Amino acid sequence: MIKRENANIDGDTAMGTMLKYGSEGAKYFVDNYVLPKDIAAAHINGDIHIHDKDFYMLTETCCQIDLIKLFKNGFSTGHGHLREPQSIISYAALACITIQANQNEMHGGQSIPNFDYAMADGVKKTYAKEYYTWLAASMRLETGIDDDQAAAIVARAKSEITEELRIANMDAYGRALLDLKPEGISEEDLKKAHDFAVAEALNTTEKQTHQAMEALIHNLNTMNSRAGAQVPFSSVNYGTDTSEEARMVIRNLLTATEDGLGGGETPIFPVQIFKV
């Protein structure tokens, strides 16, 4: 018995049955009114195979989606506009929505060719947010400065430091922070606050990234598309972004995949492709 047609279509549901009726009708129409008779006969006899023949005249097949370009300044699904995501959890959630929305517009698979690069941007934003939060908290707790003073130091750091704030560059960022010489806190205390913020930001970002990848795995194996008849046929490509942020994403994606969906069920999607 076929449980899932084409790996992702539940033919036992009402909408799955309706899709099957439409599919068979479309294939009959293509065979009898669109294709040359010899080509239609070759397919029927099994000499050739025309994949997804039911969609032959309707829409494009299989799309690679550039999430970096799509997420910049936000995008519309056709049902509403979504602002640019600002955390790894939002990046993962909107990646699922993107795949789901596109699956409703075309047949075939929906692929993200630069998954590691795209999700690394989300990790970078999350890490920066966590770092500044922990930096302010540490300065308040360890030195006794008030909220306004801590916020002012963080604001100066954001506006005046030109060093890029990312996981592999925190030593240089720390030196630039000390060069600000803010009032109300010693250089020693500021360095301690920085070191503490770096460690805690890395820890909390790792946890949030795992949650994001776990949610992505669960969503892509359960969320409906095409009127509830199937889950999107999704794939992600990764392996060429060697930044710490990208490696954090893929490490947690693999861990979440290994953990499975629960009840001993192995996730079918996304198909994971390692690029070289």
Question: Which residues fall in each region the model found?
Answer:
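Conserved catalytic cores of very large enzyme subunits
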Residues: I2-V276
